[in-house]
Amino acid sequence: MSRVTLSRYLIEQTRSHNTPADLRFLIEVVARACKAISHQVSKGALGGVLGSLDSENVQGEVQKKLDVISNEILLEANEWGGHLAGMASEEMDNAYQIPGKYPKGAYLLVFDPLDGSSNIDVNVSVGTIFSVLRCPDRNGDTGDLGEDAFLQPGTQQVAAGYAIYGPQTMLMLTLGDGVKGFTLDRELGSFVLTHDNIKVPESTKEFAINMSNQRHWEAPVQRYVSELLAGETGPLGRNYNMRWIASMVADVHRILTRGGVFMYPRDAREPDKPGKLRLMYEANPMSMIIEQAGGAATDGSQRILDIQPTSLHQRVPVFLGSKEEVLRVTAYHRG
């Protein structure tokens, strides 16, 4: 039986599900950019790409060399193809305007070019997260694209995915009809379908959270985690294992493939900030993927995909993964 490449899968989606050709081409370009990023990541110290720069991004976070390299790869790969009206990135304060010499398309691309980059110097898996939205009708306006065009709830995503750069490079993708996993065949130079119709187990015995922040959590999270730690003699009646990689892509990938709950709650240290993770290019695409795999994703009080964004770099608390556990911790928040 012949192997199904990403290109073949997307062509078949165009035939059977009327996936627009422009969306197919866009996903293929993003995938090629992810291959280029994977190549840069794999060089490590040999390529002189490790370490930090003297600059900070809009979040006030020190930029790694590979943050900037990955961001440039995605911008340069996607700006000229005619599929996009604009882009936005964790590494840029404002929306990226498609240069006037290139045609503009119907979609918006939002991304975290290198999630988990704080771990890159110690050779931990990192990744790229992306979300695709339709650009609202601009009624003939040819001026710069404003931030408002991007401020759409996650339910409006037409595609979402992430690439994980680990022992293998994988691309996890949803077009709104389930989740597929593709592994990069370096000999072919193509992503090949290796994981079909991925489903998150409804219940689990694993959880991912940064326990060092426990003293700062709100009461519902304190309660839930204490019940997890109580094991089979506690109210949940079973033992749980904790896993924490400190790379959202790596933690969510493990949960997507074998079950679990990922938590990044708000805490008391920065009460004016509702969370650490960004809604538009971290929480929304990951939530779409998890929901399409049968899981759930909330901010503790509501479904993440229903949140109406108010700013491009808006932060939210995140609870996602196996449905049973996400609904339990959400119920604790609701009282």
UniProtKB/Swiss-Prot annotation:
EC number, as in UniProt: 3.1.3.11
Binding residues annotated for substrate, in chain numbering: D115, G116, S117, S118, N210, K276
Positions of Mg(2+) 1 binding: E90, D112, L114
Subcellular location: Cytoplasm
SUPFAM superfamilies for the chain: Carbohydrate phosphatase
Binding note for cofactor: Binds 2 magnesium ions per subunit.
Cited Gene3D superfamilies: 3.40.190.80, Fructose-1,6-Bisphosphatase, subunit A, domain 1
This protein's name: Fructose-1,6-bisphosphatase class 1
Organism: Ectopseudomonas mendocina (strain ymp) (Pseudomonas mendocina)
Gene that produces this protein: fbp
